[in-house]
Amino acid sequence: MAEAAAAPALLTSAASAGKAPLPAFPENPPVGVWTRHVTCRYFIHGVCKEGINCRYSHDLATSRSAMICRYFQRGCCAYGDRCRYEHNKPLQEDPTGDTCTAPSESLPEPSGNINSKAAELAASELASGGPRAQDWVNAVEFVPGQLYSGRAPEAYTQGTVKPDEGREEPADPELKKQLCPYAAMGECRYGENCVYLHGDPCDMCGLQVLHPVDTCQRSQHIKSCIEAHEKDMELSFAVQRSKDIVCGICMEVVYEKTNPSERRFGILSNCSHSYCLKCIRKWRSAKQFESKIIKSCPECRITSNFIIPSEYWVEEKEEKHKLIHKYKEAMSSKSCRYFDEGRGTCPFGGNCFYRHAYPDGRIEEPQPRQKSGMSSRYRIPSPSAGIDFGSLTSERAETRLRTRKTKL
């Protein structure tokens, strides 16, 4: 109460002294006097919590100039038609019209090492309506909840630059040497404004992946494209060669079988007759015939020791040799279930395509295949893991010595 009573006394004393009285601020200042002309940024983004009680304007018609998408004006808006801002081109400014009053003559000069030419340039820009239109497009946008970093006038920033650094520096040369990944995959939204290099289109793949200057990169890419094209052509020829092949047992076109898993060929190693994998495996698993009859071809009776599963039909010798080599390499990486890391015995011996390895990684030495009907006393024992052959030999020697002593 004492402070409130002292306020009128100060006003009367100031008036009596011949000075203009200070305005008395009300206890509750009116809300929305000047803020009603400022558009609420939270309302623009649809997250204003105040609603009708907000002191800022919720009328979008009064802020059309602030709703123009600045990325669209640069030509690189990623949202396109889904952008919440307007995609309108900026209006042409009247070069003769003045948009603001002339600046005061008592314009304070900026401190520091700023020459008079930079100051005159700044004053002329302020007199003609401020910085250019494109500078406002590149201005920093204020986002609620983030720190605002202002931008100094262009003339002030250029005034402190040395004469030899006044020209615009080019883009990073390392970036210019790199190809744009977006242009290489199809389309770059930045177009000519992209900082990366857009390559020349390749005649084989149609992508912009050829470096305009690097001849080594161009030749390497063209070589890889030709190799990929040759593989695609080989695949096309293989499909064309296999689509009309008929199985010699079921007499059905292999590629037209109802079950997709049965559309595979069983290639015999020493024969060129065509069979589907299911039929030839069923033929070779019969028990009522001899082994020689089972392993022979149903048509020409030529014996084949194994069958190669294949998705495509192979008839030429060179192609069949490649297929057999790939098949053996693939099987050699899998462990044999009969050998079972040395705990079992494989009936195929050294002719087995699967991997015979012990738990410690040692590979079994090739053993001759066990013939059926051979007596067990003539079988060659296969080494197994966990057996100490030194102790086994010493036990046999002791047994023989005891037998001799008993005879004596």
From Swiss-Prot:
SMART domains: RING, ZnF_C3H1. A zinc finger (RING-type) spans 247-301. One of its GO terms (molecular function) is zinc ion binding. Pathway: Protein modification; protein ubiquitination. CDD domains: RING-HC_MKRN1_3. Keywords: Metal-binding, Repeat, Transferase, Ubl conjugation pathway, Zinc, Zinc-finger. PANTHER family: E3 UBIQUITIN-PROTEIN LIGASE MAKORIN-1 (PTHR11224:SF37), MAKORIN-RELATED (PTHR11224). This is Probable E3 ubiquitin-protein ligase makorin-1. It comes from Xenopus laevis (African clawed frog).
